[in-house]
């Protein structure tokens, strides 16, 4: 028996894994190359990670993953990444960041929401009533209900799309 060179990449399979691989060969599963990491998340947000897995796919779309599963602690990795970013100067430290109380943040969000609602209402008021022409009132109401826009905007969209309900609704819901 010859010796294994120092830099050789050798993996020793246990008996159960060897049997499983033989069965996979018989099932006709195809190996998917290029996958570096596989993670599984349970309901309680516990994460299992497999580094450098061997992944096989069946014809039905199911996957079989071989590798050593380890419990992954994401919060520790996040804290380490933040410390590294602060050390390199990419992210400011906690003392440099201006903090706001939750009440101030909610007040800012409320003011921004009121400003956008008022601006939209002013736009509709400035234009006045738009002539519906030969458009069906039921079509106009349907567009208003589906997109939560004003009647004037619904009429404009229907006119722009020659009375086509689907295209008018799609253009307003973007």
Swiss-Prot record:
Domain UBA: 135-174
Compartments, record wording: Cytoplasm; Nucleus
GO biological process: 'de novo' cotranslational protein folding; cotranslational protein targeting to membrane; protein targeting to membrane; protein transport
Biased composition range(s): Low complexity: 111-120
Modified residues (N-acetylserine): 2
Lineage: superkingdom: Eukaryota
Keywords, sorted A to Z: Acetylation, Cytoplasm, Nucleus, Phosphoprotein, Protein transport, Transport, Ubl conjugation
Major location (coarse): cytoplasm
SMART domains: NAC
Nucleus as UniProt keyword: yes
PTM entry text: Ubiquitinated by the NOT4 E3 ligase and the UBC4 E2 ubiquitin conjugation enzyme.
Anything else known: Present with 38016 molecules/cell in log phase SD medium.
Function as written in the Swiss-Prot or TrEMBL entry: Component of the nascent polypeptide-associated complex (NAC), a dynamic component of the ribosomal exit tunnel, protecting the emerging polypeptides from interaction with other cytoplasmic proteins to ensure appropriate nascent protein targeting. The NAC complex also promotes mitochondrial protein import by enhancing productive ribosome interactions with the outer mitochondrial membrane and blocks the inappropriate interaction of ribosomes translating non-secretory nascent polypeptides with translocation sites in the membrane of the endoplasmic reticulum.
UniProt remark on domains: The UBA domain is required for the stability of EGD1.
Quaternary structure, from the entry: Part of the nascent polypeptide-associated complex (NAC), consisting of EGD2 and either EGD1 or BTT1. NAC associates with ribosomes via EGD1 or BTT1, and with the CCR4-NOT complex.
PANTHER family reported for this sequence: NASCENT POLYPEPTIDE ASSOCIATED COMPLEX ALPHA SUBUNIT-RELATED
Protein name: Nascent polypeptide-associated complex subunit alpha
Organism: Saccharomyces cerevisiae (strain ATCC 204508 / S288c) (Baker's yeast)
Upper taxonomic lineage: Eukaryota, Fungi, Dikarya, Ascomycota, Saccharomycotina
């Amino acid at each position: 028996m010859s010796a294994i060179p120092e830099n050789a990449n050798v993996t020793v399979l246990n008996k159960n894994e060897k049997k499983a691989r033989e069965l996979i060969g018989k099932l006709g599963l195809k190996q998917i190359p290029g996958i570096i990491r596989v993670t599984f998340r349970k309901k309680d947000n516990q994460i299992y990670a497999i580094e450098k897995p061997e992944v096989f796919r069946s014809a039905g779309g199911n996957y079989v993953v071989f590798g050593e599963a380890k419990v992954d602690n994401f919060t520790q990795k996040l804290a380490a990444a933040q410390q590294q970013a602060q050390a390199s100067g990419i992210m400011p430290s906690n003392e440099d960041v201006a903090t706001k109380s939750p009440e101030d943040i909610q007040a800012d969000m409320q003011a921004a929401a009121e400003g956008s609602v008022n601006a939209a209402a002013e736009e509709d008021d400035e234009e006045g009533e738009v002539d519906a022409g030969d458009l069906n009132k039921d079509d106009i109401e349907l567009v208003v209900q589906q997109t939560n826009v004003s009647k004037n905007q619904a009429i404009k969209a229907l006119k722009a799309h020659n009375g086509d309900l689907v295209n008018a609704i799609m253009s307003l819901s973007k």
